[in-house]
From Swiss-Prot:
Enzyme class: transferase
Protein name: DNA-directed RNA polymerase subunit omega
Compositionally biased region (Basic and acidic residues): 63-104
Entry's EC annotation: 2.7.7.6
Family annotation (InterPro entries): DNA-dir_RNA_pol_omega (IPR003716), Pol_omega/Rpo6/RPB6 (IPR006110), RPB6/omega-like_sf (IPR036161)
One of the GO biological process terms: DNA-templated transcription
Gene of this entry: rpoZ
Protein keywords: DNA-directed RNA polymerase, Nucleotidyltransferase, Transcription, Transferase
Secretion signal span: none
Stretches assigned to coiled coil: none
Organism: Streptococcus pneumoniae serotype 2 (strain D39 / NCTC 7466)
Length: 104
């Protein structure tokens, strides 16, 4: 049974088998969690879809993993601050509406 994509083709895209396994697993988890696909797929399973993306060159290993982690942390913190500000505005609006209602 011939597997598609072949291991040889995939190893042309990453430096080692270890890197391939890690990249494939991480991307498969992302796809399972609802990350947008970079292409149409032939396969049904997320692991094989991840391998298809690696083969096509749409998914690669980040050259600066610590930089990527920091960018993700910043994005999460920014999203958290935005949500907190939004909640604060909603609470202020509710308080204002209550106050206006009591004046009538």
């Amino acid at each position: 049974m011939m597997l598609k994509p072949s291991i040889d083709t995939l190893l042309d895209k990453v430096p080692s088998k270890y890197s391939l396994v890690i990249l494939e697993a991480k991307r498969a988890h992302e796809l399972e969690a609802g990350a947008p696909a970079t292409q149409g797929f032939k396969s049904e399973k997320s692991t094989l879809r991840a391998l298809e993306e690696i083969e096509s060159g749409n998914v690669t290993i980040h050259p600066d993993p610590e930089g990527k982690r920091e960018a993700v942390r910043r994005r999460i913190e920014e999203e958290k601050r935005r949500k907190e500000e939004e909640e604060k505005k909603i609470k202020e609006q509710i308080a204002k509406e209550k106050e206006d209602g009591e004046k009538i």
